[in-house]
Amino acid sequence: MSYIQEQFFDIGANLTHKSFESDLEEVLFEAKEIGVKRMSITGSCLEDSIQAAEMAERFPEMCISTAGIHPHNAKEYSPEMFSEIKALLKKEPVKCIGETGLDFNRNFSTPEQQQLSFEAHLELSLIHISEPTRPY
């Protein structure tokens, strides 16, 4: 009987948070020790997206990153700023768009601000819709 070792990919590592500044390498080591093979460092605003890309460049064997604007940060959205997000998507470690979406639970940004930001993200996305005329 063969043994299959479980390996995990963490799709939403919020490692740009200031609480990880002093021990990032230790966090990555511990993640690897418990079976995390790779992880995606999440960008939730322009600054975090830049920082996430830099982290992923430092640890390419384990990390990739995302670039995007979280709904809570949508109040920061502008077409000029989003051009910088798009430019980040051309960097090697940046593999995904996001974090993005709509979050009307706490409304740190207005619904209108969230919609503008989300629509900009959608324009960059590949969307698959099966049987779009069929009502669900």
Model-predicted segments: where are they?
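Active-site gating/metal-coordination segments in enzymes
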Residues: 2-23, 46-126
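Single conserved hydrophobic/aromatic residue that forms the stacking wall/gate
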Residues: 127-136
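Catalytic beta/alpha-barrel core
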Residues: 42-45, 130
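Short active-site oxyanion
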Residues: 36-40
